[in-house]
A protein has these predicted regions:
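Hydrophobic secondary-structure segments that place a key small or acidic residue at a functional site
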Residues: 67-70, 81-88, 102-175
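Mechanotransmission and gating elements of multispan inner-membrane complexes involved in transport
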Residues: 141-245
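Alpha-helical membrane-interface segments at transmembrane helix boundaries
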Residues: 12, 16, 231-248, 268-269, ...
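C-terminal membrane-exit region of the final transmembrane helix in multipass inner-membrane proteins
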Residues: 344-383
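Transmembrane alpha-helical interface segments in multi-pass membrane proteins
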Residues: 265, 272-319, 351, 359
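Short helix-loop junctions at transmembrane helix boundaries
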Residues: 305-351, 365
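Hydrophobic, regular-secondary-structure patches
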Residues: 5-84, 107-113, 213-216
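A hydrophobic alpha-helix feature that marks transmembrane segments and, especially
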Residues: 1-9, 238, 242-280, 288-293, ...
């Protein structure tokens, strides 16, 4: 149960980390309309004012950057596909997302490289092109007319999911602003808060409280959204995770309970004469029940001790991670990375041990009560 719990927790953490690393961040600042309609018309017109406020408000160690993120089409002589155009500050973006994590070919974008583009390896393969070749981006500009521009491929990246490689293309923020004709405007500010004892990204309540406090400081027309608000499906999955795990522990324990009851019943039946003799000597049924439950408790504690040692040893042996690439399509469906590192929290260990200990004693009540009801006459008749 510890091993399964650790693996499940690792899968959940992998899914969450991958989602936040795919351009979501911990908190995003957008206009009120952008989330429902992510087009360039719903942009932040005066980012300088927002920049000043963020530099004063955010805690030390926070990473943040402006972005332009819109839908568009990538095209060359061989192919064309719908993609998401992401205008970034190359110097800041590497600290916020998967950008720069795994460069497959070429190099990253640099500040001032307004004619370069950084694409996924899968996208470049689909377009049958190579480094140095041009890729045309087509989208709708701020004037509602079609805007297009050619960029040279500077490099390619590998991502945890092939779909990510096909979806996102990166250009500099200045290049995106020029393409769309929006001067200094941006569509969002992505924020990555420093994690520590006062902040845990899996603590949805604390994260949403932080975003609400930030929203109160923002200029009119802007809002701060936590990753839970940006990814409601993932938020729902995580909120059900602990309940799902507890239910799974109960199911596994039900299978274990049959073996435990069988063991205790055999022990009671084999000691029928002993219990009958104790009854004849005046021992009360409640004392016999207490003795049987005490024996059961000792067995459970010994079993938990051995099981915990084995579970911790197994998780420790998998500390380097489990390569899930053999089920790559399945892991991509759930948004997991290719490497899952099992781990347990103190809460997980306590929950598993509590379920086994409490339910184990409840299961042992039947053999204990049966032992308490044995009479001296029944014991004498027992061979």
């Amino acid at each position: 149960m510890l091993t399964f719990g650790g693996l499940s927790r690792g899968m959940m953490e992998s899914t969450l980390s991958n989602a936040l690393n795919t351009l979501t961040g911990h908190i995003q600042i957008q206009t009120l309309e952008y989330r429902d309609d992510p087009v360039i018309e719903n942009r932040i017109e005066n980012p300088d004012l927002l920049k000043t406020m963020l530099n004063k408000t955010l805690p030390p160690g926070t990473k943040w950057a402006f972005r332009i993120q819109i839908s568009g089409v990538a095209s060359n002589a061989r192919n064309s596909e719908g993609i998401t155009i992401v205008g970034i500050d190359p110097d800041r973006e590497a600290d916020l997302s998967f950008y720069g994590d795994n460069v497959s070919q070429g190099r990253l974008l640099t500040s001032g490289d307004d004619h370069g583009i950084f694409v996924g390896q899968a996208l470049m393969d689909n377009f049958e092109t190579k480094l140095g070749r041009k890729l045309v981006l087509i989208t709708q500009g701020a004037d509602l007319k079609t805007a297009s521009r050619a960029f040279k491929i500077r490099g390619t990246f590998r991502a945890e999911m092939e779909g990510t490689e096909k979806q996102y293309v990166f250009i500099t923020l200045a290049a995106a602003q020029k393409l769309l004709g929006v001067d200094t405007a941006v569509t969002s500010a992505c924020i990555k808060l420093p994690e520590g004892k006062n902040l845990n990204i899996t603590d949805l309540t604390a994260m949403e409280q932080t975003s609400r406090e930030l929203s109160r400081e923002l200029p009119d027309g802007l809002t701060a959204l936590s990753w839970g608000q940006l990814l409601p499906l993932l938020k729902g999955y995580l909120s059900m995770f602990d309940s799902f795990m507890l239910l799974w522990y109960l199911v596994v324990f039900m299978a274990m309970a049959f073996g435990l009851v069988n063991t205790m019943l055999m022990a009671v039946l084999e000691r029928t004469r002993e219990f009958g003799l104790l009854k004849a000597l005046g021992m009360k049924p409640l004392w016999i029940i207490r003795n049987v439950l005490t024996e059961c408790l000792i067995l459970l504690i010994l079993g938990l001790f051995a099981g915990n040692l084995f579970g911790f040893a197994t998780i420790r042996s998998l500390a380097g991670g489990i390569d899930m690439s053999f089920v790559a399509q399945g892991s991509e469906f759930f948004g997991m990375g290719h490497i899952v590192v099992p781990f347990l929290t103190v809460k997980d260990v306590l929950a598993i041990n509590a379920v086994i200990l409490i339910l184990g004693l409840l299961v042992c009540l039947y053999p204990a009560i049966k032992a308490g009801r044995i009479t001296p006459v029944e014991a004498m008749a027992h061979i």
